[in-house]
Amino acid sequence: MAQTVPGSDDAAVAATGVDGEVAVASTVAEERVSVASQWQLMWWRFRKHKLAMVGAIVVILFYVAVVFADFLAYADPEVSDAQRGLIAPQAIVWFDPDTGSFFPHVPGLVGKRDPLTFKRVYAVDPSVKVPVQFFAEGFEYKMFGFIPMNRHLIGVEGGNAEESIFLLGTDIQGRDMWSRLMYATRISLTIGLVSVAVSLVLGVVLGGLSGYFGGWTDTVVQRVIEILRSIPTIPLWMGLAAAVPQDWSVLQVYFVITIIISLIGWTELARVVRGRFLSLREEDFVMAAELSGCNQARIIFIHMVPLFLSHIIAATTLALPAMIISETSLSFLGLGMRPPAISWGVLLQQAQNVQTVAISPWLLLPAVPVIIVILAFNFLGDGLRDAADPYN
């Protein structure tokens, strides 16, 4: 006579219920994936890449600083004062040490002459507290290029060399390093962005023409690519940058340096685009578009390029760090942006003197955002590349 184990039916029902829920959940997930667009699938894969998400947040924060550089800078980056040269960085003290109340301030500075070098040096005077104001008034600027403003994130009222705030210290000419770093971030990151945009256009157009038409067009484009890639990049950039006249304006030099950096960057993307076009031009939808009377430009840019647009985005994101490094290197060597222009490379020019760096190590601080941005873009590019890979 068969015995019934108490609770066995309930356990079986519960197990069946759990399996059913798992099966339903699996079916729903599969159905969701089957109806998702390419961009949705990319986003789902991308957000699983934690380092890429961190890199994306860092990049967004830096470009927010690019847009609001004037607001974040509390001092005019061009105003110099020999009386406050090479002041060490100051830290904001958030609470009053005497009362314990919230009172953001920086300790005052006392200037005196060094009896050995006869240079003016500054010492901290804890008895003097310089209040730090948020949304303080300062030098005038134009937000977004057309809105006149004079408000800044932080600042102090008036003040002289002994009563001012210098978050990252000052350079040898007494210019505030924090404010100059904000403006340098704007120049360096926009040069990289514009250079990548130019490389993107050249790479897609020339690579697309090479792969779609083939024949002598493909031969000419590929030979040009091989010639450009056979020339050492740094000497080529240095030679072209050295040919820029010294009397050109900052805007003229900006666009010339952008073009010089873009000169080599488009070749790798052009080869990738050419390879994809060689495989796509034999597809049925291309033949259908040709038979329906579509012109060749429409076939290339409307029908073929969108099929691997995600790969192009990933490739351009990975190319951005190289562009930024190129501009910084050229400017550091004195062949890129030149004073009065402000870029990361221009700021690092003062760090070429070992003796100056030994006395004022904060002059090396502009190298920190360079490292952070390069790492962030590399993580972001890796995440986009993996997300754009349908076999990943």
Predicted regions and their residues:
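Alpha-helical transmembrane segments of integral membrane proteins
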Residues: 170-392
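Gly/Trp-centered helix-boundary motif
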Residues: 1-200, 204, 340-341, 351-380, ...
